[in-house]
Amino acid sequence: MAQVAVVSASHWTQAYLGLPYIMGVGECAHRAALVWRQEFGFEVEPPPAHGDMTVAQRHIEAELAKPEWCRVRRPMEGDAVVMWKGNRVCHVGVWVAPGHVLHCTRKDGMVLTPVEDLEPQGFRVFGYFRWQEQVAMAA
């Protein structure tokens, strides 16, 4: 897996790198929710804690349909990066400038991946989404 040192040892992402993937309670959406709460100050409800991937996928789709989220063309630090396989949302991470995604995989736990390396790993970017308070900050 391509990992590039794009941030300093004191960058906020360092606190999350290596956190393990834990089925049902430490999956991608749970870890993204943790980052949004601790680093960006907003609460996103993670999927129920039972490890059912179909339920988790539906939860991510339902969360993004809420009015608090706005789809954007150009991501900024903290935006949701939503990925899919086939025609279903399957994965979510957090945009980290410049051009990286902090996300949690079953194999590696929390990692920082260049956006161009996501698709070769099976994650096609579906879109970028911004929480409403972040929209106001970006304006």
Please tell me what each predicted stretch does.
Residues 16, 39, 91:
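Short glycine/serine/threonine-biased micro-segments
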